[in-house]
């Protein structure tokens, strides 16, 4: 518990500083979305109250506008097609927790909930780090405590933390991603040098708990479907060793649970709700069998992203987006560096799935997405935080700089400047989003 004191204090200080930046910034925003939303649900007198004007109105920026707008609808569903790209799970949670449907009550509930979930994610990551690295080398438990402490501190001021002052959905996925990985860690014991033991007594934690957590993370943020590679990796491992029963009861069953809920959310429900009278993506069924017509070439989410935000292979690779590539560059570098570092330093089966997930995620964002969002959504994967923390602990021990230390040092310096700047840009409704 003593090791958690520093991360908790650091978390509180960072949040106070960020909210101070927001409160002291000018009240005008670059975009009119906030004013339009406020005009729809609030009186002029309400919007001009001191804390509303100086804090809460400013937190309605970028995606948070859509989350709160959906939370305020009569049926709890988005009003327009493009709004389905923003987590209905998160908006529904806000709506269900809020004690009333008053706009500012909903907004304040969302902000409190956001901070609580963000804090819980930090605590979960602390224990996940300690368990993961304690298992990798039980002779160095004190080092795993140091690693966990610094990782939790880093998480508090990660590259997307400015967005998480407002009601954003990402911390919910961070929390359940970490809980899912933690459940798997609890269920699987490493066998030195290159093996895993799947304990039958821990099947509930692996098959039910981890799949439940990964499902929530994925339904909230679809990029978390990559966490399913844990199950692919474990299935291959067990099948190669002819442990077919364990393969079926552990990773195959768990993976099917996540996949079924993902298909239901991304394909089945949108097809049933939208495809009776429309064409476009609805007419692109992959299987010519009526009960499975909902399995289309594109999901509703993919269609919205390509139609409304022009996502696609190399679509973002244009000269005018060079600044956005530069905004995301430090995070791309630290993510790729972490995969090479742990492939070289920790060639352990416990980290291999996460290395693959990190590489796949980074490449997908680089080629298909708005690259600057990597700063906001990448922290559902903790590998780069572990990389920075491990180098910090090792440098503290021997005081010798390596190539990795220079990368880590540069990234930390960038974070020191980036977090307050990005918080300010978010308040003004300015890029990068």
Curated annotation (Swiss-Prot):
- Domain of life of the native organism: Eukaryota
* Residues annotated as transmembrane: 4-24, 109-129, 148-165, 172-194, 204-226, 247-267, 322-342, 354-374, 410-430
Q: From the Swiss-Prot or TrEMBL record, state where the protein is found.
A: Endoplasmic reticulum membrane
| The keyword Acetylation is assigned to this record | no
Entry keywords, A to Z: Endoplasmic reticulum, Glycosyltransferase, GPI-anchor biosynthesis, Membrane, Transferase, Transmembrane, Transmembrane helix
Its membrane topology: Multi-pass membrane protein
Name of the molecule in the record: GPI mannosyltransferase 2
């Amino acid at each position: 518990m003593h090791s958690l004191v520093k991360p908790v204090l650091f978390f509180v200080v960072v949040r106070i500083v960020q909210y101070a930046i927001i409160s002291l910034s000018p009240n005008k925003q670059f975009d009119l979305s906030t004013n339009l939303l406020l005009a729809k649900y609030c009186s002029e007198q309400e919007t001009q109250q001191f804390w509303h004007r100086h804090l809460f109105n400013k937190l309605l920026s970028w995606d948070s506008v859509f989350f709160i707008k959906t939370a305020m609808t009569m049926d709890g569903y988005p009003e327009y097609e493009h709004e389905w790209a923003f987590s209905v799970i998160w908006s529904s949670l806000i709506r269900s927790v809020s004690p009333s449907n008053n706009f500012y009550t909903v907004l304040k509930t969302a902000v409190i909930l956001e901070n609580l979930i963000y804090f819980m994610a930090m605590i979960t990551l602390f224990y996940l780090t300690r368990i993961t690295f304690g298992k990798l080398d039980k002779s160095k438990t004190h080092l795993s405590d140091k690693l966990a402490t610094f990782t939790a501190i880093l998480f508090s001021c990660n590259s997307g933390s400015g967005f998480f002052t407002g009601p954003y959905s990402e911390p919910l996925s961070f929390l359940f991603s970490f809980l899912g990985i933690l459940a798997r860690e609890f269920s699987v014991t490493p066998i030195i040098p290159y093996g895993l033991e799947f304990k039958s007594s821990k099947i509930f934690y692996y098959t039910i708990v981890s799949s439940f957590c990964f499902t929530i993370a994925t339904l909230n943020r679809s990029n978390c479907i990559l966490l399913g590679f844990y199950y692919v990796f474990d299935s291959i491992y067990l099948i190669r060793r002819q442990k077919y029963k364990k393969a079926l009861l552990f990773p195959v069953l768990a993976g099917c649970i996540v996949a079924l809920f993902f298909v239901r959310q991304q394909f089945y429900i949108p097809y049933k709700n939208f495809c009776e009278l429309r064409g476009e993506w609805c007419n692109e069924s992959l299987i010519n069998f009526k009960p499975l017509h909902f399995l289309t070439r594109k999901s509703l989410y993919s269609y919205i992203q390509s139609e409304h935000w022009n996502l696609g292979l190399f679509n973002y690779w244009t000269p005018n987006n060079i600044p956005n590539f530069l905004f995301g560059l430090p995070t791309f570098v630290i993510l790729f560096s972490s995969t090479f570092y742990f492939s070289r330093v920790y060639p352990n089966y416990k980290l291999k799935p996460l290395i693959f997930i990190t590489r796949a995620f980074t490449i997908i964002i680089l080629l298909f997405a708005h690259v600057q969002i990597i700063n906001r959504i990448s922290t559902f994967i903790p590998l780069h935080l572990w990389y920075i923390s491990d180098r910090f602990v090792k440098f503290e021990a021997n005081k010798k700089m390596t190539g990795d230390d220079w990368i880590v040092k540069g990234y930390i310096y960038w974070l020191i400047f980036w977090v307050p700047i990005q918080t300010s840009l978010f308040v003004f409704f300015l890029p990068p989003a």
